[in-house]
């Protein structure tokens, strides 16, 4: 139940930030705006992870340095996703097959990058937490990613 409440909180708190991202035509977001949104969402994620995982001192000492690197790598992938979203928004009214194919291939590469990142970092999280706790972390991380992606997807119109 605690996890559910935390996830609902993340959605509620991130909704205004995400909703702003689709107002590209009305008021373009600056890089500084995007960075602030990312920092806010990351702080919320950190709190949810802390609350859900209830780390011991030794686990926290081993986990957070690895997670900091992992989160930075996630941010790099998120930046690529943002670039695709912006490209999509700029081309939605004039979308042709070639542009749709290009955007799809870029998103497939991003999805592959996310899975590769998770596989790469799993041994490090397992070393820090043990296999069972590392698996739990990945459950939490996956749920948080799904919530953010669902919110983004709900704000992006389908190709006409």
Predicted regions located by residue number:
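Start-of-domain marker
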Residues: 44-46
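Amphipathic, charged alpha-helical segments and their helix-to-coil junctions
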Residues: 22-26, 33-36, 40, 115-160
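Sec-dependent N-terminal signal peptides
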Residues: 4-14
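Sec/Tat signal peptide C-region and signal peptidase I cleavage site
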Residues: 15-19
């Amino acid at each position: 139940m605690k996890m559910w409440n935390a996830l609902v909180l993340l959605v509620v708190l991130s909704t205004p930030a995400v909703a702003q991202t689709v107002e590209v035509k009305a008021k373009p977001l600056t890089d500084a705006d995007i960075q602030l949104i990312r920092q806010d969402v990351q702080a919320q994620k950190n709190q949810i992870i802390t609350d859900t995982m209830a780390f011991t001192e030794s686990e926290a000492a081993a986990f957070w340095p690895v997670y900091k690197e992992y989160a930075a790598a996630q941010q790099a992938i998120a930046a690529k996703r943002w670039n695709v979203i912006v490209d999509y928004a700029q081309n939605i009214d004039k979308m042709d097959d070639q542009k749709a194919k290009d955007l799809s291939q870029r998103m497939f590469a991003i999805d592959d990058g996310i899975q590769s990142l998770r596989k790469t970092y799993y041994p490090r999280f397992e070393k820090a937490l043990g296999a069972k706790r590392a698996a739990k972390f990945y459950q939490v991380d996956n749920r948080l990613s799904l919530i953010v992606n669902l919110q983004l997807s709900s704000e992006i119109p389908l190709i006409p």
